[in-house]
Amino acid sequence: MHASDEELVARAVTARDQAAFGELVRRHQSRVRSWLRQLTRNPATADDIAQDTFIKAWDKLHTFGGQGRFAAWLMKIAYTEFLMTLRKAKAELRLADAVEAEIGEPPVHDPTGEQNVAADLERLLGVLGDDERIVMVLCYAQGLSHGEASEILGMPVGTIKSHIHRGKEKIRLRFFPEEVPHE
């Protein structure tokens, strides 16, 4: 019989059992990486953030109180790591802009990490704002409840529902206009 996530967490916390934590990583790494790839649109960056997520989870495992699912707790860490990476990237972009203004040419661009996301999904998600896209991916692609998405993103459940409604409406208007009732 396989141990539950909660049993593995307990073993990892009480005995610092790396094998138990390794099993947790094995169970959840695909979901975390997939979500981060949808957020970042860059597989290499997503994998880096996923690695940071699991390191942080190991360090903070003792803080998981068992309220809610381990997967939701892990996704919250992944989202926080994503936001930290985003802030760092924005700061680097401001620095690159300053360098370009100073020397009159843009810094060398590294074209590695081209997106491998399915074109149709990317087109659908491309019409959404950041918050709508993040919420839609969490609730539909990752299968989390509105409550879990609320906890991960630090948004009220009503806001989560509003983002989903607006996101669906934008997709419907853009890609399925014949289904929109005319008044």
PLM region spans:
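Short helix-capping/turn signature of helix-turn-helix
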Residues: R27-S30, Q38-R41, V137-S145
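Structural recognition of an alpha-helix C-terminal capping motif at a helix-to-coil junction
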Residues: D48-I55, G68-T80
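Hydrophobic-face residues of short alpha-helical interaction/recognition segments
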Residues: V32, L36, L61, L74, ...
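N-terminal module of bacterial RNA polymerase sigma factors
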Residues: M1-R26, S30-R31, Q38, G126, ...
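Helix-turn-helix DNA-binding module
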Residues: R123-I134, L138, Q142-T159
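C-terminal edge and immediately downstream basic/flexible tail or linker adjoining helix-turn-helix-like DNA-binding
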Residues: R41, L93-R94, E114, A118-V127, ...
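Short, basic/polar amphipathic helix motif occurring as a linker/hinge flanking DNA-binding modules
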Residues: H2, M75, T85-N116
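Sigma70-family region 2
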Residues: V13-T14, R41, D52-R69, K88-K90
